[in-house]
Amino acid sequence: MILYEYPFNERIRTLLRLEDLFERFTFFLTQEDAREHHVALTTLFEISEVAGRADLKSDLMKELERQRQTLAPFRGNPGIEQNALEAVLGEIEQTLSGLSQMQGKTGQHLADNEWLASIRSRAIIPGGTCKFDLPSYYAWQQLHPDQRRQDIAKWVTPLLPLRDAATIVLRLARESGQASKVMAMQGSYQQMLSGRSYQLMQVRVAPELRVIPEASANKYMLWVRFTVQDGDLRPRAVDVDVPFQLTLCSL
């Protein structure tokens, strides 16, 4: 099944963006070629932009503290797997500690590094990081891959508590939902939300159907409409029934 996810609010939207960026960053950082490490570095700049939102750190700390207070009373409950509970609580407490130790504006260490700042300013220009534009960057790219990885790992380290916090919050949200099998009649589906507050919607479709869900929602109702791509890859509305799995997630 192909999984599509749709955030219901700006906070979850930001966390999904962070998750996607960190996954891309990790993939390219583990490679060997200097061009792949260039992608890792420019992705680090994107992470800094997204993570630099003024209230992100405080939002994550509040949510993790809320989850800690919700889960802690289950200690000693015979109906709860205690090892799993302690693992989650330990992860939350460790991440809260990491967030509390973050000092200053998020990503400021990258802005204060003049060499990185010069690369960042050139990277937004098409072809702006050629060897004649940034000879010192080109020289760095000639270093051994392990040295480049070590440098990039040092630059990303101050941002890792945000990654860890986003991972926990998204995992708890995803684990809260239960998938149900539904049918989009003539490619369209809608459902009343009965006043319940959700943070995330997941849509799973069989890959052989080759359909693409487009979703929207408000606090009363959600809509899912399926399209297919024509020869020019433009979306075209589906007019047949489409089976899919729907999961609504709430923290």
Curated annotation (Swiss-Prot):
Compartment annotation: Cytoplasm
GO biological process, one term: FtsZ-dependent cytokinesis
Keyword tRNA-binding: no
InterPro entries: ZapD, ZapD_C, ZapD_sf
One Gene Ontology term, aspect cellular component: cell division site
Signal peptide: none
One Pfam family per UniProt: ZapD
Keyword annotations of the record: Cell cycle, Cell division, Cytoplasm, Septation
The protein's role, per its UniProt record: Cell division factor that enhances FtsZ-ring assembly. Directly interacts with FtsZ and promotes bundling of FtsZ protofilaments, with a reduction in FtsZ GTPase activity.
Family: Belongs to the ZapD family.
Subunit structure: Interacts with FtsZ.
Name the UniProt record assigns to this protein: Cell division protein ZapD
Source organism per UniProt: Paraburkholderia xenovorans (strain LB400)
